[in-house]
Regions:
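Bacterial Sec-dependent N-terminal signal peptides
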Residues: 1-31, 524
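Catalytic domains of carbohydrate-active enzymes, especially glycoside hydrolases
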Residues: 63
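Phosphate/ribose-recognition catalytic cores of enzymes acting on nucleotide-derived substrates
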Residues: 100
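Well-ordered mid-protein domain cores that form the structural environment of catalytic cofactors
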Residues: 103-125, 129-150
Length: 524
């Protein structure tokens, strides 16, 4: 019997506990909740933008979550249908079933979960198990997790299980423990009072088979540990973390092996109208997987946070500054100042200014140099009661040799104007105009979008993305969005250009597409 079957059998056996809890409704307070998310694409071939030919007349990523909560017992499951997945997702995710299910027992100072769960230790340098549907990431753990709160300010976590890999699970067994203690520097543990938080984590990856490389046996156990601390003395917050990984030859590091390490330092100042963030990190051979031969986004045990700024609301600002866990030194400095109302620069309604500098490079001068650099300025200004403006300038450098399949360093300049006019409480119009100058082979791009919102239910938008450099191709698109209560529905038709979708420093490539796009979300 597989681990999944064993766990499912246990859940079925324990589920009557949840039903029994209904008899204690007055004291237990049972609640049911869930959600449905369905994204559908009906493709149409377009030779002009080189869309792919698909065997499926329609493709969808559909998810349905069901959860029950009570005073002592929680339970839930998620159904997924990706038998015909959306373009750009890894082929391994093709399938359907119930990969996520759990039952959780809760007491005053303890919590035990059996089944599937997500977890993160610290910033994720030793363990980050999470779901990111836009990228096709789900590295949940099937097994058991215990969370203890024995003392005020103390959290202890212990877990064991196997990591999800597409529709199965990796052979390696993960075992980990994390401990964190917050010490008040005054008599209060309130978030606004000075405090010192110390944490430590340990993760073991046990590979059951004795793999060999060039005749040499690889060690079955890979160990990761980290130490971290947070000092909070308002308005200053300081954070530091160090992580270490034992010898781990894998496809990620070219089976070179050797130990890995990383550190993160950050300092944040935030008071009144001013905030400043300074941080740096260094990573070397730290990425660990539950399958040594795996590449791509699957079977990742830990996580390398990105120190690059993301401008997710804007079309032409997307790039792919994915952290390089084998060799990277990164820095970021970000400042925000809100000019007060009634001042010369603040005007009647105030003005916000944000400046950012991000830089990531190789640890070795002969291995790629600069990976990515971002210098940006954002001005957000409300002109009057009805009209507001936002201006962005972004200067980017990215190394296409390292981050993409190119062979050059690409220089981008991006200019964005975002304007919103509110005619009344129900009707508003948003205009987004973007221009990208680039040394990339396709050259410059121009993007424009108009969105009319009729509150509380409707939004109508039209856009065009035009390659005014090499191809002269237009990517026009129209969309209608409707929302009512817990329901959200959007229907769009048109062309979508090839682009990288990035979240938290991890990316996947979305191919050029044309056709009908439908998205539906419901929460209950």
């Amino acid at each position: 019997m597989t681990l999944a079957n064993k766990t499912l059998t246990i859940l079925i056996a324990l589920f009557p506990l949840a039903l029994f809890a209904q008899e204690e409704k007055d004291s237990a307070g049972i609640t049911f909740s869930g959600s449905i998310e369905s994204n559908i694409h009906i493709p149409k071939y377009d030779e002009a933008i080189e869309t792919e030919h698909y065997d499926d007349w329609a493709m969808t990523n559909t998810y349905a979550n069901f959860d029950m909560e009570s005073r002592y017992v929680d339970a839930g499951a998620r159904f997924e249908f990706l038998k015909h997945p959306l373009p750009g997702y890894e082929e391994g995710f093709r399938g359907w079933g119930v990969p996520y299910y759990y039952i959780k027992g809760k007491m005053k100072c303890a919590e035990l979960t059996l089944g599937t769960f997500y977890e993160q230790f610290g910033s994720g340098l030793t363990l980050r198990s999470y779901e990111e549907r836009s990228l096709g990431i789900d590295n949940s753990i099937l097994g058991a997790r215990l969370v203890l709160n024995p003392l005020k300010g103390m959290i202890i976590k212990a877990l064991t299980g196997k990591q999800r890999r597409y529709w199965g699970h990796s052979d390696a067994l993960l075992t980990g423990v994390d401990a964190q203690q917050t010490f008040p520097l005054t008599r209060s543990l309130d978030d606004n009072h000075p405090s010192l938080t110390l944490g430590a984590s340990y993760v073991n990856i046990h590979h059951p088979s004795q793999e060999t490389l060039e005749g040499e046996k690889l060690k079955r156990n890979v160990n990761l540990f980290s130490l971290r601390s947070t000092l909070n003395i308002a308005p200053v917050t300081l954070y530091a973390e160090y992580a270490h990984k034992s010898n781990d030859p894998s496809a990620t590091n070219g089976y070179q092996g050797g130990s890995g390490k990383a550190y993160i330092f950050s300092a944040k100042y935030e008071k009144d109208n001013f905030s400043l963030l300074l941080r740096t990190k260094r990573t070397e051979n730290l990425l660990a997987r539950s399958e040594r031969t795996q590449t791509g986004l699957a079977a990742r045990v830990n996580f390398m946070p990105s120190f690059s700024e993301f401008y997710a609301d804007y079309d032409l600002s997307s790039s792919f500054p994915a952290p390089q866990p084998e060799s990277e030194q990164a820095y970021q400095a970000k400042m925000t100042y809100n000019f007060p109302e009634g001042t010369m620069l603040g005007g009647k309604y105030g003005t916000s200014l944000t400046l950012n500098f991000s830089h990531a490079r190789s640890l070795h001068k002969d291995e790629g140099g600069t990976y990515y650099q971002d210098i940006s300025a954002i001005i957000d200004k409300k002109i009057n009661e009805a009209f507001s403006l936002k201006f962005l300038y972004i200067n980017q450098i990215y190394n296409a040799t390292v981050l993409d399949d190119g062979d050059e360093k690409v220089h981008n300049n991006i200019f964005i104007t975002d304007a919103t006019y509110e005619f009344n409480e129900r009707l508003s119009l948003n205009a987004d105009l973007e221009y990208l100058t680039s040394t990339y082979y396709e050259g410059d791009w121009l993007y424009g979008k108009l969105s009319l919102t009729v509150s509380p239910h409707w939004t109508f938008s039209v856009s065009d993305e035009w390659n005014c450099g090499e191809t002269k191709t237009h990517y026009w698109y129209g969309e209608v969005e409707f929302s009512a209560g817990s329901h959200e529905l959007s229907v769009g038709y048109g062309r979508v250009s090839e682009a990288y979708i990035c979240v938290d420093g991890l990316c996947r490539l979305d191919p050029s597409m044309k056709g009908l796009f439908v998205s539906y979300n419901y929460e209950f």
